[in-house]
Each structure stands twice: as structure tokens, then as C-alpha cells.
Amino acid sequence: LVKEGYLIQVFRPDAVSVSVSVSERKRAIQLEKVDDAGFFAALIPIKKNVKYVLNIEDKNGHITRLRDPYSFGRFDKSEVIFNKFAAGTEYNAYNLLGNKVCEKDGISGVLFRTWAPNALRVSVVGEFNSWDGRIYQMERITDNGIYEIFIPQLEAGQEYMYEIKFKGTNTVLKLDPYARQITQYADAHSVTGEPQAVQDNVKWVKQRKQIKGVNKPLSILEIAYDNIPVNKAKVNYMDIARYITEYVKDTGYTYVLIKGSDSIFEKTGYCYGASGYYAPSSQYGTATDFKHMIKELHNNGIGIIIDFNVAYFGIDIRSIVNYDGGDCYGYLKPRIIEKPQMNITTFAYEKGEVRSFLISAI
């Protein structure tokens, strides 16, 4: 609201024309194109906040109708949670950052948040905006560099990345560090939404409470996916579950320690260079398939220990390495130089945000 009325401003460099449909008006109101960069504006003689829909026409004459992402305002979140995240004492940081399918003012969509303190700009890109980082630019909402945007009408299952502009001229595409799902290696993208819920074996849950390593000995088999003698091109999580079940029953192990369960993009054969700490590897199926593998092992009375490495992470350009141009998660120069073949760098543990990230992922 301004003194003269209700000002609507839209930046759509992909649009030929933009109009708005206001609930209190029968006809759409045409926005004036203010400059060639794609800035549109209109002043509506109404002295109150109104709900409106954007009608965006592209160069092919196709019109897209959507709610303005910037008309919703900030999502309510206690400052205490943001402060705990910055202090390294927020142990459920995945509820604060990443993507969340939710509603705002009765409109469904996806809320995105990411931490990038050194970035000049952060945008959400995907097929839904033709991977154009100029369209859904995020708002910096905290002093320590958390960015946020709510994109209405977006649904679960959409592939996306963050386009991050560094100081200078560099612009890179990054996976969401808090994404619960990541697609396959070559075209790795983060995916909106949560994996489907899978009900665990009730009998196993009760049995697990009784097994504490005191009244019954544990025998643990350490195994990595790459070591399983199956056809890697065709194997899936259920194939792995069947192989492990057969092997464990033949050898008498009670637990399996599985290495390399998080998303790893380095192809050196090592399981240390993790790139996705909240998403299981998509090489053998979806995150939901991974849950079914866990359930199948539990159905056969096999306990599971997931190997989780918080000592260092991978240097794939799509991952958290140099995430915001200032390497907020780690160090620009790897500290573990005696093992360069592992393609890893170390975490900056002195930063509270990094500690919250790691503890929350356990």
C-alpha cells in the first residue's frame, strides 16, 4: 500500500505482457512495462490489501495464471529457532531449511529456505520457470544469511536447484543441502516434498528395545553398496535387501553397517565424499525405495546401522563445497591434503550453522 493506492510491481523478464486479476474487479488490469529488463507495474486506486492473480503472457502467446510469490510475506517462525540454528543448538534444522510443501493464506505451494551468508543472490530454478534464475529470487530474511521464498501452486515431486550468485560474476547451480530426495548422478537435482511414509515392522521395533548388547551379543557385518556382487546397472534397493538377508542368515550376523547410504557423486570408489546428507543415494532407487529396503531387513530380524561421516564432505561442484562463494560449510582449501585421491574437504565446525546442519542430519 502507498498513499495513492495499491501498487503492484512484478519482475518477469520472460514475459511480453503482464496483467492482474483482482477479486473486486471484473476486468484484468494491464501492468505497464517500465523497462526492457522485464519490470512491470500498476497502481490500483484501492486503499486496502487485495488478493490478485498474475496473468503472464510469454513470447509464444501462452498465458500462465499464478499467484505472486512476493505477495505472501514472510512465514512465521520464532526468532528463537533462527538463533538456535546460528548458535549450533538447533537439532531439527531440517524443519527450518530445505523445502516444505505447505499452505499460506489458503494457497498450497512450496516454501524454500537456504543458508548462504556470502551470496549476492539466491534463486530457485526448475522446469517450472525454465531454469531462469531471474524469476524466483529469494529474500534474505536473517542477518546470518538465510534466504526464503514461497512459490505458490508448486507441488511435491518437482526437480529444482538453487542458482547462487557469488561476489563478482560467478553464478552456480547447487543442490539443496537439506533436500530429502535427489535424482540420479548425471542430472542430479533436488526434489520437492518428503519421501512417502513406510510403516516399520512392529515386531522388530519391540524386539529392538530388548536388544541392548548386554543380554544378547551383537555381530555386525560392514558392507558397502559397491561391494555387493550384483549387476550394478540393474540392481535396486530390494535386490540389495534380498542379498543382505540371505548372506546374514547364512553367516549368523545380527546387524549390518551400511556404508555410502547418503548421496555421493565422486566416482573414486570411496564412500567418504558425501554430497547429500539428508537424501539417500538415488543410484538404487528413490528415498521411498530406501525405506522399503530398511523395512525388509527389519522384517527378517536384521538390525541396521547407517554409516554417517561428519568428518569431511565431497567436492562435487553441485554440493555444499564453496556453497555461497565464501565456502560457508567448509574451507576453500582442503585440510586433508595427505589423501587427495578421496576428493574431500573438511567442515568448519566453529560455525554454529554447520554444527546444526550436521547434528540434525544424524
Segments predicted by a language model, with ranges:
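An acidic- and aromatic-residue-enriched active-site/binding cleft used to recognize and process polar
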Residues: 117-119, 127-129, 165-167, 261-263, ...
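Short, surface-exposed loop motifs enriched in S/T, G, D/E and P with embedded aromatic residues
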Residues: 27-35, 134-141
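Short Gly/aromatic-enriched secondary-structure transition segments
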Residues: 24-25, 127-129, 138, 176-181
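Short beta-strand elements bearing conserved aromatic residues within extracellular beta-rich modules
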Residues: 18-20, 122-124, 160
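Short proline/glycine-enriched turn/loop motifs at strand-loop junctions of beta-rich domains
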Residues: 11-17, 115-122
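The feature marks proteins involved in alpha-glucan
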Residues: 1-7, 34-116, 141-222, 230-232, ...
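Substrate-binding/active-site clefts of carbohydrate-active enzymes
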Residues: 181-183, 202-218, 222-362
